[in-house]
């Protein structure tokens, strides 16, 4: 595999020139902020641990800054882009700046939330600068839809990064934390300043690393059943679980029965529970009826 030219990556002038030629202005509606620093995208690829045999899927490639850096390191890159103009221009950018890798690139012109299959071999890694406004749903959808993804590194708003990587008991621990942890071991992997983006966002960004669990959570409950408990628990996060889960269980008494059967205090709150504990609660829905039947 030959090495790309040293100037193959996009710099600030390249980004603005490309955008001007395409008539592109980053939009808040789609949470677009383009990375304009080559050192930053190489750092992302390095932090992601991209290997020469990896098939990497990237969501929201934009003008191609990170895409080109991924192509330097991976076997194949599949980019998912919703924007008509950006999707139309990206293959030409790859061909012009990294022609020796162009055949290793594939584009999927679609909303990532609607993607159910990808061309070529199954992806082994997800690396993306995710649009701020859809970061968590897109991340969870990709992890759920493509179990072959072993490693993930996403750049998201710093606040979102903190939530994704939060541990039980943290004030920012919530639905994203639990659902991400269902799929993977999650941790913060660094911070990114505002000055490497165009336009510069009003907030800092963070890198989040997710390594797929080698063994799924041991539970007889389905993901849908477990996530229903999680959603109910955090919909009223200041309430005790006995109260917060009353609607889910059918009554406060039924919620208490499920909690006790799961070994969880009815007076606890969702922010103190691990994903395994949520799974046990889901398993024990209807525990009060089971007790009645046994009496």
UniProtKB/Swiss-Prot annotation:
Keywords: Cytoplasm, Methyltransferase, RNA-binding, rRNA processing, S-adenosyl-L-methionine, Transferase. Its EC number is 2.1.1.182. The keyword GTP-binding does not apply. It catalyses: adenosine(1518)/adenosine(1519) in 16S rRNA + 4 S-adenosyl-L-methionine = N(6)-dimethyladenosine(1518)/N(6)-dimethyladenosine(1519) in 16S rRNA + 4 S-adenosyl-L-homocysteine + 4 H(+). It is an enzyme of class 2 (transferase). One of its GO terms (cellular component) is cytosol. Its main location: cytoplasm. InterPro entries: KsgA/Erm, rRNA_Ade_diMease-like_C, rRNA_Ade_Mease_Trfase_CS, rRNA_Ade_methylase_Trfase_N, rRNA_adenine_dimethylase, SAM-dependent_MTases_sf. One of its GO terms (molecular function) is RNA binding. This is Ribosomal RNA small subunit methyltransferase A.
